Amino acid sequence: MRKSLVISSLLFSCLAQADLLDALKYYEEKHYAQATTEFNKLLPLGNEVAAFNLGAIYHNGEGTAVDHVKALTYFQLAAELGDSRAAAVISALTKKLSDTEQQQAKQQASLLLAQVQIKEIAEERTDLIDFPEVVSRRAPAYPKNAAAKGVFGYNVLRFVIDEQGNVSAVEVLGSFPEKTFNKSSIAAVKSWKYAATGKKHQGKVALHYSLGPLSKSKVTQFMQKHKLLEYAVAGSPQHQYMLGTVMDLLATNANYHVNIDKNLALELTTELPEQFFSRKSSFRSKIVGFYGSAEVKTDAKGIVTAVISADKMDKQQASALLVGKELDNDARHGHYRLWADPGKTLYVEPIITVSQLHSSHYWWSMAAKNGSLEAQRQLAAFSPQWENYLLNNNDAQVLTWSGVRKMLQGDTVQGQLLLDKAIAQNYQTAAELKAIL
């Protein structure tokens, strides 16, 4: 039973795998108490595989007495969290238990589920509400050493805009490669100018660095050198986070708009889509009355045959304006994304649709559930669930920027409380920000 329930989790669900490396190491060395502790640490993060493996431990009676009620409890929790294997085990196990025991397991699973802090990982929030208009925003200078070596990368930064529209404080939240582009990014953001609104604002930006579309050979070489896919699939949160970062860089620097289809099969392959590296570029067109963005299909002449989705306009309104209109001869038999500001030129960008395996959010979410602080902080920027989880764990960086947001929203008492908690951890940025707010 041990082979079929615990070890097979690596084989049957490697694509949805939690961070089982430490726990499985303890398990294989028969340190069952430590393995149980490690699995339990992941439950608040909504880690379905940890729940499944706890069920297996109690089912097998390894390091503990066999307890089918507890086993069913954890298998039911795993099912609630999305583990597709749990249903078959639950079906077999319930046949061994009385109605009373089944009810006990159901109640215990509900209690455990109530303690899960991350139940759905989605892009839930944007910080661009009431954001001032851009006056000037120059691109960062490419560091000479990085350019000479063909190094690509990115920075994620948060910043504060003062009442006059000047950037008064900047912090690098994430970087790849480590610190390579920090100086250039900070200098660029500090030079940005926004419309004066008479009040302060908080902003967040990701700055990507590449000398044109990324080189397939260089990206592949990097992934192979660090064995990103192999270790990510094996459950390493560090490799999952890095793989997500690479996917983010590929999508951002591609000349195609990247669509993620959650319904596509998760088929492991080391071969990256050619469209990530294609030099086919977007082009311009003009369709009177259309604004916002939309996804469309075209025929052999580049004429729009269907509108798949639209944002600023409803789909019916966008269809009335777009269907039957010719985009360009280069837009034949394709799937395209259109976007335009009111009364402005229409931009047409080809679309590539890929599975979640080529999604940064997929790998960052997995890494976060598996304990990667970097990934958790990345997701906390737009997910209240991850933000609250890190606040509850007194993460200084999240305390700082959540405190800033609270103060800018007028909740001075709560904002200062959060900043003070970060300052108590000697987080210098928190002290600097408190002084200017």
Region roles according to the model:
Residues 113, 117-158, 184-224, 240-251, ...:
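Short proline/glycine- and basic residue-enriched helix-capping loop/turn segments at helix->loop/beta transitions
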Residues 63, 93-122, 218, 385-386, ...:
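Alpha-helical linker/edge segments of TPR/alpha-solenoid repeat scaffolds
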Residues 13-15:
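N-terminal signal peptide c-region/cleavage motif recognized by signal peptidases
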Residues 39, 75, 228, 364, ...:
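Hydrophobic/aromatic packing residues within the alpha-helices of TPR/SEL1-like helical repeat arrays
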Residues 19, 26-31, 44-48, 60-62, ...:
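Short helix-capping/linker turns of helical repeat alpha-solenoids
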Residues 19-27, 36, 52-56, 225, ...:
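Alpha-helical tetratricopeptide repeat
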Residues 19-26, 51-60, 91-96, 246-249, ...:
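Hydrophobic face of amphipathic alpha-helices that form TPR/SEL1-like repeat modules
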